[in-house]
């Protein structure tokens, strides 16, 4: 199945046998419904990644979601976004060919290099926002921006994982919930949002880059998301070394009223990116790395625990559903978190709050970080993740 728009897109289905143009080298990662392999593209002699998705037991709707992701990503050609080359379709599999990204995830790379400054944060965020500005100009919203979906390839940032992306229309709200608890915008949880949900996620990422800890926490998944809805955060002592302009940008990006939240272009024009920033002292940098190491480790541990329990599910039907979820495909016709018949809830601050900036709470009110890093939990069940080619699968 392909629609007319896809047929005229330069990224088209390759009707030739895969083996004609590609020589499979090795398997990089496996999942319940697919695997990623490294392959040599014979005409160009360059290495690429191929995601092989077994579609024999997939519903038609799930296949359509795969093609929707291919369509969205094929519209994008930007140095900070993973590149898709082509795809193959057989009776058994869909083969999606992308550039091979050997670099690691953003946080892992920062931890490995043992040094990260505000100057580095500005350079990183500038590339992320540049990619998001490009996406939004193409009327595509990512909807699951987070450090795991930001790779470092050499000196270049690459955004991946467009499984939850979609086309949007100007001045038209979206209502289906997608995202990861730490980075999800409050209006998404209230099922009324626009493309600026990506800006909120960037604001959370920038906050973490500058101190190593998230602005919102909770002892459970539910508490975490309730805190996101309240949008109360603080800078406190851990931001004493951070410039006022950086904090001002974060405050703008975490504006509760998304209508008043800046666009990616607005953010890129912020004075923080043009102001000379004092280099972060080494002892402060080391503290950030230690915070980040703890946060990153617990996030990955929680994901591993989640996958373990998925594999222990008792019933055959539940295992079938879990396998789909592990492959990143949401079963059924609706892959959204919003329940059937659920009425969209309106954010209490939308249209009624003065000022619009996220309310900052007293630093002493903050709970200890890392107690409930649940990003692999309930929200992950709503994700449709197919093109995050990192040599491993969800």
Task: Please provide the spans of the model-predicted regions.
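Amphipathic regulatory helices of Ca2+-sensor modules
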Residues: 349-362, 385-394
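Activation segment signature within eukaryotic-like protein kinase domains
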Residues: 124-125
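Conserved N-lobe ATP-binding subsite of Hanks-type protein kinase domains
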Residues: 35
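Conserved short submotifs of the Hanks-type protein kinase catalytic core
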Residues: 92-105
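Conserved N-lobe beta3->alphaC-helix segment of eukaryotic protein kinase catalytic domains
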Residues: 47, 52-76
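Activation-segment/catalytic-loop signature of the eukaryotic protein kinase fold
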Residues: 87
């Amino acid at each position: 199945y392909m629609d007319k728009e896809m047929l005229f897109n330069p990224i088209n289905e390759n009707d030739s046998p895969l083996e004609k143009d590609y020589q499979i080298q090795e398997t990089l990662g496996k999942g319940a419904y697919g695997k990623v392999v490294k392959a040599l593209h014979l005409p160009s002699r360059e290495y690429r990644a191929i995601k092989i998705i077994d579609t024999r037991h997939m519903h038609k709707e799930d296949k359509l979601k795969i093609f929707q992701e291919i369509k969205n990503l094929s519209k994008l050609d930007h140095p900070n976004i993973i590149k898709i080359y082509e795809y193959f379709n057989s009776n058994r599999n869909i083969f999606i060919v992308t550039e091979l990204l050997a670099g690691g995830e953003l946080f892992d790379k920062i931890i490995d290099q043992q040094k990260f400054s505000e100057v580095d944060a500005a350079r990183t965020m500038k590339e992320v926002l540049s990619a998001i500005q490009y996406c939004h100009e193409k009327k595509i919203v990512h909807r699951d921006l987070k450090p795991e979906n930001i790779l470092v390839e050499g000196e270049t940032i690459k955004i991946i994982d467009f499984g939850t992306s979609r086309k949007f229309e100007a001045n038209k709200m979206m209502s289906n919930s997608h995202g990861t608890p730490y980075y999800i915008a409050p209006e998404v949880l209230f099922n009324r949002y626009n493309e600026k949900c990506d800006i909120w996620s960037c604001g959370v990422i920038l906050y973490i880059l500058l101190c190593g800890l998230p602005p919102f926490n909770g002892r459970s998944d539910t508490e975490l998301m309730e805190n996101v809805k309240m949008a109360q955060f603080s800078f406190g002592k851990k931001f004493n070394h951070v410039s006022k302009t950086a904090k001002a940008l974060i405050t703008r990006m975490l504006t509760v009223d998304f209508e008043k939240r800046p666009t990616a272009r607005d953010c890129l024009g912020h004075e923080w990116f043009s102001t000379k920033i004092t280099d972060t002292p080494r002892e402060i940098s080391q503290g950030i790395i230690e915070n980040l190491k703890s946060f990153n480790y617990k996030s990955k541990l929680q994901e591993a625990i989640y996958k373990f329990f998925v594999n222990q599910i008792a019933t055959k039907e539940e295992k079938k559903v879990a396998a789909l979820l592990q492959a990143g495909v949401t079963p059924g016709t609706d892959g959204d978190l919003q329940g059937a018949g659920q009425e969209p809830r309106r954010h209490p601050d939308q249209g009624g709050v003065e000022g619009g900036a996220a309310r900052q709470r007293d630093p002493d009110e903050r709970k200890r970080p890392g107690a409930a890093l649940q990003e692999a939990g309930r929200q992950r069940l709503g994700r449709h993740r197919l093109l995050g080619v990192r040599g491993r699968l969800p």
